[in-house]
């Protein structure tokens, strides 16, 4: 959190086109408790401009070779199914595909874990909710992949309900 109340939601939709142009950077995602009032009632307005699921997606959209879990352990214990993503996500990538992007508004990135047939897709947006279009044409043909989708819940809102999320599983192919 910054002393002035945190970054605006579009901040992380700008960084991939500025600081990340030269390669990986130091960034600290993984904040599940975004409201400062949770820790200090004298700061009722301070909060990070993000949702819990956006924090997960940042592990993919903001590559950093030294990732960490940036929140308090108690907050991860409150959301163990979401924390599982942080435990599982790769930190080193062999391939990256930018599937859709508009600087400052949204970005969707697919990355292949180095030395593995594991793929991760991260999609983030600014303060305006949107549905990402994810073509799986980057996947090798003739294979099926089990997908775990971490998505903002229907009632998620970065200001009012940042911890609403859904997790679902399915099968995808390159088609």
Model-derived features: positions:
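Structured core elements
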Residues: 26, 57-62, 109, 120-123, ...
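Carbohydrate-binding surface patches
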Residues: 103-143
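Acidic/polar loop patches that form or flank catalytic/metal-binding clefts of enzymes
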Residues: 65-79, 95-97, 133
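Edge strands and adjacent loops of beta-rich recognition modules
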Residues: 82-111
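Glycan-recognition surfaces
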Residues: 1-73, 100-101
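C-terminal beta-sandwich/jelly-roll accessory domains of carbohydrate-active enzymes
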Residues: 126-175
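Beta-strand-rich interaction surfaces with strong enrichment in secreted/lumenal proteins
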Residues: 95-99, 108-110, 119, 168-170, ...
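Generic secondary-structure signature for well-ordered alpha-helical cores
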Residues: 66-67, 91, 126, 175
């Amino acid at each position: 959190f910054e002393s002035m109340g945190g970054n605006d939601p579009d901040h992380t939709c700008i960084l991939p086109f500025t600081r990340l142009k030269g390669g990986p950077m130091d960034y600290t995602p993984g904040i599940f408790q975004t409201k400062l009032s949770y820790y200090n009632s004298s700061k009722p307005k301070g909060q990070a401009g993000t949702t819990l699921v956006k924090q997960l997606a940042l592990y993919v959209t903001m590559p950093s070779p030294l990732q960490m879990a940036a929140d308090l352990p108690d907050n991860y214990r409150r959301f163990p199914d979401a924390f599982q993503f942080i435990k599982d996500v790769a930190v080193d990538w062999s391939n990256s595909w930018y599937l859709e992007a508009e600087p400052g508004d949204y970005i969707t990135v697919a990355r292949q874990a180095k030395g593995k047939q594991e793929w991760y897709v991260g999609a983030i947006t600014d303060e305006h909710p949107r549905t990402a279009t994810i073509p799986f044409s980057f996947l090798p043909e003739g294979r099926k992949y089990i997908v775990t989708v971490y998505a903002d819940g229907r009632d998620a809102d970065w200001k009012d309900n940042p911890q609403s999320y859904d997790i679902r599983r399915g099968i995808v192919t390159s088609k």
